[in-house]
């Protein structure tokens, strides 16, 4: 359970980073 929770947190963190990168890229090109 603990490992799955950690995996979920890492997955969510990657999604957040990705979103921020995407938003930065869109801001740079938009």
From Swiss-Prot:
Reactions this protein catalyses: butanoate + NAD(+) = (2E)-2-butenoate + NADH + H(+)
Molecular function (Gene Ontology), one example: metal ion binding
Top EC class for this record: oxidoreductase
Protein keywords: Flavoprotein, Iron, Iron-sulfur, Metal-binding, NAD, Oxidoreductase
Cofactor(s) demanded: iron-sulfur cluster; FAD; FMN
EC number: 1.3.1.31
Keyword Nucleotide-binding: no
N-terminal signal peptide: none
Functional description taken from the UniProt entry: Involved in fermentation of amino acids (Stickland reaction) such as leucine, isoleucine, valine and phenylalanine.
Subunit structure: Dodecamer; tetramer of trimers.
Name of the protein described by the UniProt record: 2-enoate reductase
